[in-house]
């Protein structure tokens, strides 16, 4: 299913031996084996917190639009006793406007989250938000499922439906029949044709989802305001979230951007997964920039090399994204090859960050 479990729990801090060897080999000629505890304690990561809270505030704003529109949509459906054919006949223009506005809000909410995902998903004490908002599966995959169930206004409980971006996107864009209205064609613009990207959501499910989304966004923001990032948090986020390229590229390969009508991913339809990957890496580059002086305390050469490789990985993905947005079509085979290259680079970077943390005496947290 689209936008469901990414298997991040399986991304261990124990990296392949070849990666560790690479990290050891690239540490430069620094003869000191002493840790720089004082440097790590003195690190000021206020900028990381500001980056996080700026993005949580943006997410709140965009999700508030989704919720407000969802409430209006629910009221319209309720006014016709959830007769969706009648809803479109009597209120079609309003529905079309609300859903179009909601899609715009969704497209803005997505990067607001993805750019901070490296921190949210990479810091264990924040990572449950990533499961519920962006990465968790539905009840069919209990190990990776979201923690919440949706209590619908009609009294029905929708047990662990999948993460909130997944539910919202697939309802708005009509790719998951489970979340769509019954008894009417999925023809939002009233032109007599059901076209890709048109979805008339089940109002009970949709309003429950955007209410939960609003609550989760508010809660994440509250915890972000209390969050005081440490070097351990930053190093951990980089080691957990950088070597996840292969699973992201797999989702891209299975999405409509490559597979077309044969896509097995229900999500990733509003924008390409490549855009998400670039956004995630952008946040990781920002995070590394804030700890690079610590790495340089032990080895300026290593600090520079890691920065170059991480920014190079971002540039690599941005180039793929830009080519795709300009009309270039990739094949599934190319996606596999490109993903393998991205993963190779990412594992090397994570190995270097792991080695730097060890030399600095900075603890890496368990995912």
Feature roles, as predicted:
Residues 37-367:
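Mature extracytoplasmic or organellar-lumen-exposed domains after removal of signal/transit peptides
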Residues 1-14:
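Bacterial N-terminal signal peptides that target proteins for export
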């Amino acid at each position: 299913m689209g936008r469901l479990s990414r298997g991040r729990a399986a991304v261990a801090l124990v990296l392949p031996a070849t990666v560790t060897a690479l990290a050891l080999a690239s540490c430069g000629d620094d003869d000191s084996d002493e840790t720089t505890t004082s440097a790590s304690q003195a690190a000021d990561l206020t900028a990381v917190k500001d980056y996080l809270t700026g993005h949580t505030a943006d997410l709140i704003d965009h999700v508030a639009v989704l919720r407000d529109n969802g409430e209006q949509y629910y009221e319209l459906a309720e006014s016709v006793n959830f007769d969706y054919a009648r809803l479109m006949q009597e209120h079609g223009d309003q529905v079309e406007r609300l859903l179009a506005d909601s899609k715009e809000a969704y497209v803005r909410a997505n990067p607001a989250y993805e750019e901070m995902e490296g921190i949210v998903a990479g810091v264990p004490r924040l990572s449950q938000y990533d499961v519920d908002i962006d990465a968790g599966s539905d009840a069919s995959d209990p190990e990776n499922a979201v923690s919440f169930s949706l209590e619908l206004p009609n009294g029905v409980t929708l047990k662990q439906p999948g993460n909130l971006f997944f539910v919202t996107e697939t309802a708005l864009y009509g790719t998951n029949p489970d979340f769509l209205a019954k008894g009417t064609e999925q023809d939002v613009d009233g032109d007599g044709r059901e076209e890709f990207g048109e979805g008339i959501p089940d109002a009970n499910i949709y309003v429950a989802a955007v209410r939960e989304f609003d609550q989760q966004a508010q809660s994440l923001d509250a915890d972000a305001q209390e969050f005081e990032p440490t070097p351990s948090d930053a190093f951990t986020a980089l080691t957990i979230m950088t070597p996840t390229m292969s699973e992201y590229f797999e989702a891209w390969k299975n999405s409509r951007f490559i597979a077309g009508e044969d896509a097995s991913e229900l999500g990733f339809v509003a924008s390409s997964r490549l855009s998400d990957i670039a956004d995630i890496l952008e946040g990781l580059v920002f995070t590394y920039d804030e700890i690079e002086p610590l790495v340089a305390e032990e080895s300026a050469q290593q600090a520079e090399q890691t920065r170059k490789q991480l920014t190079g990985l971002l540039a690599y993905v941005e180039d793929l994204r830009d080519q795709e947005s300009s009309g270039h079509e990739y094949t599934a085979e190319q996606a596999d090859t490109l993903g393998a290259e991205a993963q190779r680079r990412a594992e090397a970077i994570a190995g270097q960050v792991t080695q730097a943390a060890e030399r600095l005496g900075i603890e890496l947290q368990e995912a």
